[in-house]
Curated annotation (Swiss-Prot):
Protein family membership: Belongs to the bacterial ribosomal protein bS16 family.
Coiled-coil regions listed: none
Organism: Albidiferax ferrireducens (strain ATCC BAA-621 / DSM 15236 / T118)
InterPro entries (alphabetical): Ribosomal_bS16 (IPR000307), Ribosomal_bS16_CS (IPR020592), Ribosomal_bS16_dom_sf (IPR023803)
Gene: rpsP
Name of the featured protein: Small ribosomal subunit protein bS16
Keywords per UniProt: Ribonucleoprotein, Ribosomal protein
Signal peptide start and end residues: none
Transmembrane segments: none
Amino acid sequence: MVVIRLARGGAKARPFFNIVVADKRTRRDGRFIERLGFYNPIATANEESIRIAQDRLTYWRSVGAQASPTVERLISQAAKKAA
């Protein structure tokens, strides 16, 4: 099964997450199929905190990829910012 989830990056106490498409059986930060965007939880006011490639997200959902609950929340936040 293919899932859309967060892969952690960044330094200790400075998290940064990539939004990736990966096989469900791989490790959280392991190999992934495609990077769809990023989430920076500690972004300052003048930095971008969420970016998601909507066209690729739509494609992966159309072929059956399931998004994690956290990614679902981030998708809705990004949609509110875009509107």
